Amino acid sequence: MTQYSINEDAIAESSGGEFEREPVPQSKLKSWKCFIGMYAGEHAAGTEFMIGPLFLTAGVSAFDLIVGLLIGNLLAVLSWRFLTAEIAVKNRLTLYFQLEKICGKKLVTGYNLANGILFCFLAGAMITVSATAVGIPFDMPMPKLTDTMPNGATWIIIVVLIGAVISIIAARGYETVSKAADWMSPFIVLAFLACGIVALSQLGVTSFSDFWNIWGEGSDPFPGQIKFTFWHVVIWSWFANGAMHVGMSDLSVFRFAKRARVGWVTAAGMYVGHYMAWIAAALLYAVYLKSPEAQAFLSLGEAPPVAPGPMAHNAIGVFGIIAVVLAGWTTANPTIYRAGLAFQAILPKLSTAKVTILAGSLATIAGLFPAFAMKLLDFVALYGFILAPFGAVIVFEHFFHKKAGIIKNYAESAKLSFNKSVFWAWAISFGLFYFISVQFDVFLSFVTFPAWILCGVLFLVFSKLFQKQVQ
């Protein structure tokens, strides 16, 4: 055994095999095959059963949906490949440890707390999705689009049991999360495809024009929803995972990649999940909207419920129930794993398994409240807007620190616990564009990229100014 191998084994043992506070060693790097299942599984998953129908409630047209998703998902793949994966293989650090080097311990603690909690809310929405399938044999009342609170004891019991299983899987670490996705994702992808085909038959589609006319020129949004245009679809689908790519959260995943080109595997998630699966789920909801139950809601001026379990069950029976359960798991598993890493940075004395169980418990509590799933379009937009600008700090420092003449990883080198350059860059960009969104009723996803750019530029400017003062 070489000294290099001995050192790698020592690192792995001290880190519990997750390498939270050191670069991933060469012997632990993984090929593209280890990532494609995770991304296909995570993005052809529980969120898709919610997002597809929610596009219909927003009154999208056929062109807006089909072409808008094509472009928006391409922008997401390019962001992962040329930003996230590129930086990840250079540094091989988690997002949280990388930010600590730049921001300082105190500042990054606040970020990690917000990041972990938001991840838990997202995972909770996926537990909600799985619960709508598990509850079918028990004749459980399904949550409505406007529901916020648990609707009964059966709902609570099912959510708690699902949350416990998901948390245990996530707590076993990246290897288990990746393997779970590898096993589940082919089944889920096949289920989405089958649901789409069956729904087309139920809708009487026999030609492309029939398919196009399902959405046609669009419609008025359902009560309580906003109208989605072409640009809403493009920008929202680009930043649906903004915290993961331009926000750099997936540094924690791609640090295990052998090469940056592994970032291209995210296309499996975007075009199998955020394209085929969203459209298939929208077709399931289109079938439901023709039912007497849905028509009764619409006649009363109310939005029909979006319950993935019954919709999939109506299309492909028990196979649909199983698919929805597994789809929720494959999104919640890696999301809880990421949340655990965020909490690990705040509570470094706790093992990865313990903080992941903590994250899973919070996600389970969130899953009890259907609002996180029913308002998923709005929540995902807010989530990306809050977290993405922090990724700009990493990106702009990585690519422009030499041109800007600033010191890389300044908090680490200057032994700062609070880098005010980062704080003011984020606070100004967040405050300015959130004000614009609220004051002028601008869709939040529209201002995410401008806020990201401004945060990166301000970080370079403030770093140049403050570092010069210190020197």
Predicted regions and their residues:
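Membrane-water interface regions at transmembrane-helix termini and the short interhelical loops
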Residues: 57-59, 86, 102, 110, ...
